Amino acid sequence: MVIRPLATEKYAVMPKTALDVIDCRIIAALQANGRLSNIELAELVGLSPSPCSRRVKRLEQDGYIEGYRAVLRRDRVGLGFSVFVGVKINGHANEHALLFERAVVEMPEVVACHLVSGEADYFLEVVVPELADYQQFLVGKLLTLPIVREVRSNIAIQTLKAGAPLPLDHLQ
């Protein structure tokens, strides 16, 4: 299998720049509560508001902070059916894999896509309202891609942990 960044620039590997203790406090605080005002954040990390704001902007520009969003409860918005899908593709030349990656990135039902080692080439996380919608996604979208050779679906019975903050202890 050819290993390279995903088809979208969004996922390109960024060079690692040094984070100091204050930067680590800022990203930990924002990860815990992305709605903090700059004044609240500055107070939490021990800075005045102006330097705090500059640091946040730098962390955003350097790619440490990708964005801010509300985390929705899937079941409350009618997306209570989650499937983890292992996909094998035909051939592993860059152009074949890129076609698959570009197609999957455009599918709104796919909330995560990973290039993996092991039995599958890719592992997708798919969310839909119910089983019939997954069947429609599978037959009407995923299996219509000529590069897809095999699909193995694993239906989530219960979610014990999802959307957890990233562990940042190694940065300190």
Stretches with model-predicted labels:
Residues 1-172:
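A compositional/biophysical signature of low hydrophobicity enriched in polar/charged and small residues
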